[in-house]
Amino acid sequence: MAYNHGVRVKEQATSLVAPVTGTAGLQVIIGTAPVNLAADPYKATNVPMTAYSFSEAVEQVGYSDDFKNYTLCQSMDACFRVLNIAPIILINVLDPKKHKKANEEQTVNVEKMQATVKVVGILADTVEVKANEATLTAGTDYITTFDDDGYLVITLTAGGKGASAKTLTVNSTSIDPTAVTESDIIGGYDASTGAETGMELIRHIYPKFSMTPGLLLAPGWTQKSNVGIALAAKCEEINGVFTCECILDIDTAEATKYTDCNDWKNENGYTNKHAALLWPQVKVGTKQYAYSAIFGALTAYTDASNDDVPNLSPSNKLIGITGLCLEDGTEVVLDELQANLLNGQGIITAINDSGWKSWGNNTACYPANTDPKDRWFCCRRFFSWWGNSFILTYKQKVDDNGNYRLIESVVDSENIRGNSYVPSKCAGARIEFSEDENPVTDILNGKIQFHQYLAPYVPAEDILNILEFDPTMLSAALSGGE
């Protein structure tokens, strides 16, 4: 053993653990996309894909302005073009091997060695081209690309068999978004193959990307009660431990007036505390979106602009739209009084108040549930986010010795973390270890329980100023103050 004489130091690992910061408003969006335009159409189905830019999303799943048939494109446009927020996670369920249809034979004219087949959704690998009854070979006699409208463009090669052709005969197969059903969105598990589809892929997000879902969306689908209720159910117990929120739409083909919305909500069972329920649809110029696509992007943008902490309500924020409408395009005009009626029924809407703004703070559980942590959308999200962050931060402590040092480390770290968010992000946050909540029998079974108290700010939804006439002021003014 060494003989020590002098002054020495020794470093020890810090007992306060730095928190792991996730993406608070990470959107997981399920729907359909024009995968025939993707870089690899046959590897874009039922696979979660993360996108940090519009071009990256287009490369992975394709893009079209046909939002009714290709619902993922609503969120792609809303996130990257309307509000500019990233990343997002896309889950396309349109399967080009399953959801497809044979097209009628097309005869197209050739101009300057090119011919455009004006049929949407063509799968390039299914194309058969003939010129003067001669079958042409792809890659040798011609190449295929897609134009900005999604139409197939056939370019003849100078030395190919069809170089002199004036017309081409084209047979092809297209993807068929109308063949996608609610069951495809909800998804399931194939016991024989082990394959998971649709919403079942939500559990893949953390293992694949090391990020926890913040918001679940399926614009264009959640107005269908089977889909909406299933998506709300997926907000809890993700990977057995994580929690998030979802954004749902009311069917504007059925609820055509604001007075129809409450009955529709209750009849369809949209009362989950983890759900924000929206009405009606929105427009940006000529484009028509499910409101959930825009509101999801707005919520994520609000978080990102606030140090990635979801304590702010996305209500009364500019949303970049140009109007409200129903499914058939009929304009909807709401004033604040009508919008407030919807808010009181647990429905979020939008109003034009010197610019179009989101309007509403209550989750779908209101007014049946008035617990502040559940009824206020920002408070509900704050609790989910804090819980997820706690799990991610202290997972490294699992299987360490269950001694006082571990307990002290968690309590000290969490209280320091909580104090760092006061007063800007919350009114208070503290954690305790109580012997009353940790009987010896639990300790012997390896179970340790903490008790944390959180106080996120509730939104200042109703600000009242009482105005009263003061005759003494008038008297003083007229008498010269004497």
Sequence positions of predicted segments:
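A glycine- and small-residue-enriched flexible loop/hinge signal that marks low-structured segments
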Residues: A2-T21, Q27-T45, M49-Y52, K68-P96, ...
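Compositionally biased, low-complexity/repeat regions
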Residues: I88, H99-A102, N171-D190, C426-E482
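Surface-exposed interaction regions enriched in Ser/Thr/Asp/Glu
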Residues: V127-I185
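Short, ordered beta-strand-loop transition motifs
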Residues: T107-K112, T140-V153, T252-E254, Y270, ...
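Acidic, low-complexity glycine/serine/threonine-rich segments
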Residues: W376-D436
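Extended beta-strand solenoid/passenger and fiber regions
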Residues: N84-F146, I175-P177
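Generic recognition of long tandem-repeat/solenoid scaffolds
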Residues: Q114-V119, D149-G159, I348-I351, G355-Y366, ...
